[in-house]
Structures are given as C-alpha cells and as structure tokens.
Design a protein with these regions (language model features):
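Substrate-binding/access-modulating region of protease and related hydrolase catalytic domains
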Residues: 1-106, 157, 165-182, 194
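Short, well-ordered secondary-structure micro-motifs
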Residues: 13-14, 79-81, 124-133, 152
Length: 253
C-alpha cells in the first residue's frame, strides 16, 4: 500500500499541545517536540490517521492479505501505542487533539511498515536513513528507496525520460518510501513462493528475521529531532534477500 505523503493537515492556527505528558501553550510549530513535517505552500504539513482507511487495511489483513505500507516522507517519527510519544498532540483553532507521532493512513500495526534507506552511506560506513523518511519504533524495516529507476506516467511532476526499448513508456529516477516498500514486497513474494500458506503475521516475522541488524546509522536517542538521519528509537533492520547466495535462511512455521 503506497501513499507516501498520507492523509494530512498543516501546523497552522496552533493553540497549544502536550508532549510526553506535559502541556504547552504556543501558536507555532514546536520542533523541539518533534513537530517536523514537510513544507508546503500552505505551511508545514504532517500526516494523520483516517479511521475508515485503517479499518479497511485491518480487514484485509484479517482476510489473509499481506500488506506492506510505505512509512511516509514527512520526516516524522512514528511511535507504537506503548511509546512515550504516541500520545503527543497539538490543538489548533476549530479542531480537537491532533496526534502527530502516530503515522499516516493507510496504517496498521500488523502491516509491515517500510522506511527508506539513502543511496549514500553514512560517514562511518554504515547505511543511513534517507532524511525525509518516517522513522521511530513504528517502522519495521528499512530498504533501499533512493535513486530508484521506475516507470512513471507521461504527465506528472517528475522529470521523466524515454524507456529506450519503447519510447512511448517513460522512466524516472525516484526516491521515497514508495520506492523502498516494493523492495520488501519482492522479497516477501519470494518467501511466499517458498511457503504459500504463511499468514500475514508469519510473513512479517520471516521478513524481520531475515534482516541485517544494527547496520544503519543511529544516535541511540529517541528524541534527537534535529538529526534527520536519526532512527529515533526505530528498529535497526535493513532488508536482506534470504535467498541470496551470501545468506542462509530456513523458513519454519
């Protein structure tokens, strides 16, 4: 499921909020509380949850459909329900509490949520999260999603080029979690080919088990909002194809 910018609203007309149990009063975006978002002509925008969309995702999972979600490209942290930041919110004129660390729809805790890895490595030689990628404990796996050659429509905002074998088709170099999540889908398809009876929970477990761990740059902090490369408490998991000759992996249900 790809909707990389998700449902959202802007950090405008702010009246106050609450960060980790402490109330605050202000009329502007508070970056020290993790209110980052992406800049648009109408102001800084962040993603929100849509109950009806999330319900549809849960129903698909309950029906046995395997769901992989692009985490989003809004620089925001996604926390889990038990996390310190899950209930952080702000209020704005004419609205109730707006929770900004819960990710954007489509979203489900049982789905596989994928973040984006940059094509350039960190100065220490580790992989690094793409600056714009969502992060935090709510992201399950990171996969390559920067400088990916992909097909695009003939009329879009990207600077497309011709596909050499057939110039009626267009290709473009794209980056984002919408490019990272298909990588996970591909490995997931291989795992399902090996064991087609895997449930969504089992496939998610298999994909997580096959990941490389601690290979991504991390500060070890969960609130260093000024560092756009920080995982902010995210799972340090990098996608690996378990069927590659470099790895040995056995599926057991």
């Amino acid at each position: 499921v790809n909707m990389s910018w998700g449902y959202g609203t802007t950090f405008t007309n702010i009246t106050g909020g609450n960060y980790r149990g402490t109330s605050w009063t202000a009329t502007s975006r508070q970056t020290q509380y993790g209110m980052i978002g992406t800049y648009t002509l109408s102001g800084y925008r962040f993603v929100v949850r849509n109950t009806s969309v999330d319900t549809d995702v849960q129903e698909m999972i309950d029906a046995g459909i395997h769901i992989c979600v692009a985490a989003g490209n809004s620089y925001q942290k996604i926390d889990v329900p038990t996390g310190l930041d899950y209930d952080n919110y702000f209020t704005k004129t004419g609205s109730g509490n707006l929770y900004y660390h819960r990710g954007g729809s489509p979203f489900d805790d049982e789905a596989l949520v994928v973040g984006n890895i940059d094509s350039a490595v960190h100065s220490g030689g580790l992989e690094q999260k793409a600056s714009s990628s969502e992060n935090g404990p709510g992201v399950d796996i990171y996969a390559p999603g920067t400088n990916i050659m992909s097909t695009v429509s003939n009329t879009n905002r990207f600077d497309e080029g011709d596909y050499p074998p057939n110039t009626s088709f267009k290709i473009c170099n794209i980056g984002g979690t919408s490019m990272a999540s298909p990588q996970v889908c591909g490995v997931g398809a291989l795992l399902l080919q090996a064991n087609p009876h895997s449930t969504p929970a089992q496939l998610k477990s298999h994909l997580i088990a096959s990941c490389q761990t601690n290979g991504i740059y991390s500060t070890g902090l969960d609130n260093d909002y000024t560092d756009t490369r920080s995982l902010k408490g995210s799972n340090n998991r990098f996608l690996v194809n378990p069927f590659s000759s470099e790895y040995k992996f056995r599926i057991q249900n």
